[in-house]
């Protein structure tokens, strides 16, 4: 209307929008060291979404949708985290314009699949009208704005840790932290081994829920949010804050990660130990303890030393500073024999030769899907103090790096205390059950999106993945030379 009356021009409206984009980048969130590792980058999570549907199922794309994309192109700044909802009614040119933004290398927008997210939210009790009007809160988590208290980053759950507990019979650094599922070297079938993993997983999930629910109660008692509660239905009419369960929809959403490592680990164990019998479980366990052919790294030396010292203290011995130094020195000198080292190298090579997840191999991809169920299905039976349900997500942000640093070697050949694989969101996973969101980042060379033909192929890639019921995609478009030059001259690459 203002355009028709001459009150504002399209160009000046675009400039105002660009200014809002700049203003959003005035903010910064200073994180502690642990949070900075888990949420690496300029992650303020001010999410703005365009496209999608209204409550009646009509496409809501309009001129402002394109102007928002253009604003991100113009300012080349990380905020807002622009997202695009994609469904079978999305205008093709909206997707082309979004692809043009992706081509700039800014890492935006994120693409979300209505055909998966809406049914996933319906499965969590949202009405159809509310599910159709979902938006993204934070990183990749869908919810109905103004009606939800989702606590979408309630925890990060490393799926490799229960596997470590299977090999240690529930022990960690000399303490029983899991359940005792038996001596792994005496498990005669793969089914027995996999069942032990599932039991450790369920127990770890119960610990997570207990911790999260305790924190939830503490939030309600110690850090009430009266202003936010005024903005969320039905807090006022119920006379309850969001922390007390005043919102219409209440959830707790812990994120699981490490699916790729787990799929490869389970397949390798089944193949090498139980089917081909090329490696005994005793050898596998020993290889993991020694970190394959790498030997004990600094973190392993520290962990073993602490375990020995704790055992000495528990036994009534007086542990002095000199004692601690002597133990540390002794552990540092520990090395596998030449024969052990040769065998560990052979085992690691055999693991490398075993087929891996992500290569359209059904036997391996089955484990990825099943491990996801092992995490998500037990999770959804729990409830929080606000009367809401637990709902799982499958993504690590960047927590796979610090939490991988706390994880020993894994049976897929990953060395101790290195990052756990982040890739989890592929089409063969059941995204309908992961209503707290998934994350699937990919990297492309700029030449892949060159010209109109490159954009068309890129849009087809997204549509194909979404036709296979994937939930989310996001892309980095940059070449190696640019990244190397950015390390030398960061002032030239403020947009990266």
Predicted segment positions?
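Conserved catalytic cores of very large enzyme subunits
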Residues: 1-496
């Amino acid at each position: 209307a203002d355009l028709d009356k001459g009150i504002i021009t399209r160009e000046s409206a675009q400039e105002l929008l660009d200014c809002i984009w700049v203003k959003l980048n005035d903010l910064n969130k200073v994180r502690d060291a642990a949070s900075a590792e888990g949420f690496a980058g300029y992650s303020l999570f001010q999410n703005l979404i365009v496209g999608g549907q209204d409550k009646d199922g009509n496409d809501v794309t309009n001129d402002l949708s394109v102007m928002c994309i253009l604003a991100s192109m113009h300012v080349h700044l990380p905020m807002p985290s622009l997202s695009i909802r994609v469904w079978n009614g999305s205008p093709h040119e909206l997707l082309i314009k979004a692809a043009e933004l992706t081509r700039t290398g800014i890492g935006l927008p994120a693409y979300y699949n209505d055909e998966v997210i809406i049914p996933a939210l319906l499965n969590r009790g949202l009405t159809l009208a509310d599910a159709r009007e979902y938006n993204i809160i934070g990183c990749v988590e869908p919810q109905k704005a103004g009606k939800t208290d989702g606590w979408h980053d309630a925890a990060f759950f490393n799926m490799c840790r229960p596997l470590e507990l299977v090999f240690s019979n529930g022990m960690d650094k000399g303490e029983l932290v899991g359940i005792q599922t038996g001596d792994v070297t005496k498990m005669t079938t793969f089914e027995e081994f996999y069942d032990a993993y599932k039991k450790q997983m369920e127990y770890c999930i119960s610990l997570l829920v207990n911790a999260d629910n305790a924190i939830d109660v503490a939030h309600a008692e110690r850090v009430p949010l009266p202003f936010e509660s005024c903005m969320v239905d039905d807090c006022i009419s119920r006379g309850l804050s969001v922390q007390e369960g005043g919102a219409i929809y209440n959830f707790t959403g812990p994120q699981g990660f490490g699916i790729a490592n787990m799929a490869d680990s389970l397949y390798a164990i089944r193949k090498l130990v139980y089917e081909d019998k090329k490696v005994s479980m005793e050898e596998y366990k020993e290889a993991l303890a020694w970190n394959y052919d790498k030997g004990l790294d600094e973190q392993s030396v520290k962990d073993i030393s602490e375990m020995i010292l704790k055992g000495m203290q528990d036994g009534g011995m007086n542990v002095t500073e000199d004692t601690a130094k002597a133990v540390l020195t002794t552990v540092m000198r520990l090395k596998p024999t030449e024969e052990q080292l040769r065998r560990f190298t052979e085992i690691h090579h055999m693991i490398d030769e075993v087929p891996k997840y992500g290569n359209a191999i059904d036997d391996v991809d089955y484990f990825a899907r099943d491990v996801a169920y092992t995490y998500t299905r037990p999770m959804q039976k729990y409830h929080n103090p606000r009367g809401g349900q637990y709902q799982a997500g499958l993504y690590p942000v960047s927590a796979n790096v610090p939490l991988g640093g706390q994880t020993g070697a894994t049976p897929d050949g990953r060395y101790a205390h290195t990052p756990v694989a982040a890739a989890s969101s592929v089409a063969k996973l059941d995204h309908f059950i992961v209503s707290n969101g998934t994350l699937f980042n990919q990297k492309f060379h700029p030449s892949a999106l060159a010209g109109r033909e490159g954009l068309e192929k890129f849009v087809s890639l997204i549509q194909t993945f979404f036709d296979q019921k994937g939930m989310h995609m996001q892309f980095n478009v940059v070449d190696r030379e640019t990244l190397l030059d950015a390390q030398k001259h960061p002032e030239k690459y403020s947009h990266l």
